[in-house]
Amino acid sequence: MSTLADTIHIENVVASSDLGQELALDQLSTDLPGAEYNPEDFPGVVYRLQEPKSATLIFRSGKVVCTGAKSVDDVHEALGIVFGDIRELGIDVTSNPPIEVQNIVSSASLEQSLNLNAIAIGLGLEQIEYEPEQFPGLVYRLDDPDVVVLLFGSGKLVITGGQNPDEAEQALAHVQDRLTELGLLD
């Protein structure tokens, strides 16, 4: 039997790390195959990997941000590859720079249509924003876990702000429980 938790899919994981030294981005972008650097448009080097599919932003300060990965494991694998590629250029990268997950964006479904007006009234104005003229989704800010859930009339949800994949499951369970309490879910 499938559960609503089975509808959760990680769409994007963003993580950061630090190489611990300043980098010459002009040289780095020349030496890293496929790297892009247009300082007039963006202050960092964009280094894309096909496997795992991701983009790593490398800044002069040595800070790096990996985005586009579909799992926390993929982020670690991607940054491991990036660190290895940078080491091969003769740049000293510590063996295991700490990697910190900043944001996980997940999608999920309640598998039924939602009356967002009724939900906005039921949940109260303290934790929600709903202005359908501005944005078609209802923004629901949770405290535990500390995430934001976007609810759409289709029953689809986007859960963002988490730093652990389990937080999406906790958020979905919370939303399901609250809407059931309010009599707004079948």
Curated annotation (Swiss-Prot):
It comes from Halobacterium salinarum (strain ATCC 700922 / JCM 11081 / NRC-1). This is TATA-box-binding protein B. One of its GO terms (molecular function) is DNA-binding transcription factor activity. It comes from the Archaea. NCBIfam families: PRK00394.1-2, PRK00394.1-5, PRK00394.2-2. InterPro entries: TBP, TBP_archaea, TBP_CS, TBP_dom_sf. Pfam families: TBP. The gene is tbpB1. PANTHER family: TATA-BOX BINDING PROTEIN (PTHR10126). Belongs to the TBP family. Keywords: DNA-binding, Plasmid, Repeat, Transcription, Transcription regulation. Sequence repeats lie at residues 10-86, 101-179. General factor that plays a role in the activation of archaeal genes transcribed by RNA polymerase. Binds specifically to the TATA box promoter element which lies close to the position of transcription initiation. HAMAP family: TATA_bind_prot_arch. One of its GO terms (biological process) is DNA-templated transcription initiation. SUPFAM superfamilies: TATA-box binding protein-like.
